[in-house]
Amino acid sequence: MGKLHSKHACKRRENPEGDSFVVNGFIAKRAAEEDERYGNNLKDYKNEELKDGRLTLLHCPLQVVLPPEKAEGCESFLQYLSPDDGERDAQKVKKRISLQDLECNVSLAEDNRQEWVFTLYDFDNSGKVTKEDMSSLMHTIYDVVDASVKHSCNTKRRSLRVKLSVTPEPAARRRDATHTERETSHLSQVEPVRSEEHRSADRRQSTHIRGQTEAHEGNHYCVDENTERRNHYLDLAGIENYTSRFDSSSPDADQDPPSRSSHSQSRPHSQEPETHVYQRRSQLIEPCVAPDPRLRTGPQLIRSRSPKGSSRFPGVIPNVTKTSKCHGHHQPIPTGQDVYHLTQQNHTHAHTPSGLQHSHSRRIRSRAREQQALTPVKNTNATALVQRHEHHHHHEHHHHHHYHHYHQT
């Protein structure tokens, strides 16, 4: 090979500065000659205008001619067009072909469209579809379509476009749709029911806890304090309450716990009629003897409702008031069968005081004083028994209404 066709020689130098690239001197000389020849031609015409034919070697066309684009489906229609037809054929072409909707290698004529429908029986009977099943299915569909497809214009290119959509049968589709609608409606109905159940359970639990706390905190108050308070103030004003007089007593008095029995039993028995209370009071007063005139003065007539009220009056006998806050609680000496019957009856009444006597206590005490003034009494022990009975009612009355008794004198 000559020097012109020889490659660049890379020689390694022995100095520590590194390698050097040695270029063939003949190639550099040829490039310098070409530069001088073309440079002289440009220098000659630097200050003059270029004329036609001077630079023929450098003249080249800058326009690129491209072949016309043709659609595959419309070749048979376009090749038979002649320029003699004129505007009539141009309008037909515009009607048949829309350049905006045109796609490469796709025919838009409706006659060339073909449709295949594949019905698959028990395709997902097992409920699982793998990639192998899908690939074998696609290969089968492609083979069937390729064998039965009809290409227009008998062209060499074969481009096949397949659209696969898997849909159930119409009957199965309706059945699935109704089933899903029923399930969704059922679920939408079940959720509010569950939420209502949770809300009602929360309400029951909260009311149960609230009832327990109220029972532990305020077990010494009456069940219906507002009604008792209203009746008491109506009695103080001189207005009789006829609604609480004729109400029936509730049967749940015996089912209360023992810790609340002494205080909550006044509510069920507070709705007894006034006639029974008046008969009990008359039964206790008739067989009694006249008390000592010293006992009828002071606290027996005024009846202070505060627990310290009876000790404020100086006319009370010491043996009556030394064993209690108010009047004496000493045991009476039974003198006969009637007195024993009175003590037993008095014990039963002491454990079941009536709230109606609290609400109408002033009118009842006035009637009792009239009966004591008219009836001659001979036994002093019965007097203490009557005083004990009277005091027990006032003592219970203090427990129920102690929040407004301090305003009275």
Swiss-Prot record:
It is found in: Cell membrane; Cytoplasm. Residues 389-409 have a biased composition (Basic residues). Coiled coil: none annotated. Ca(2+) binds at residues 122, 124, 126, 128, 133. Residues 247-268 have a biased composition (Low complexity). A lipid is attached at residue 2 (N-myristoyl glycine). InterPro entries: EF-hand-dom_pair (IPR011992), EF_Hand_1_Ca_BS (IPR018247), EF_hand_dom (IPR002048), Nkd-like (IPR040140). Residues 171-185, 193-224 have a biased composition (Basic and acidic residues). Disulfide bonds: none annotated. One of its GO terms (molecular function) is calcium ion binding. One of its GO terms (biological process) is negative regulation of Wnt signaling pathway. Residues 166-224, 243-315, 346-367, 388-409 are annotated as: Disordered. Residues 109-144 form the EF-hand domain. Belongs to the NKD family. Cell autonomous antagonist of both the canonical and non-canonical Wnt signaling pathways. This is Protein naked cuticle homolog 2-like. It comes from Danio rerio. The lineage of its organism: Eukaryota, Metazoa, Chordata, Craniata, Vertebrata.
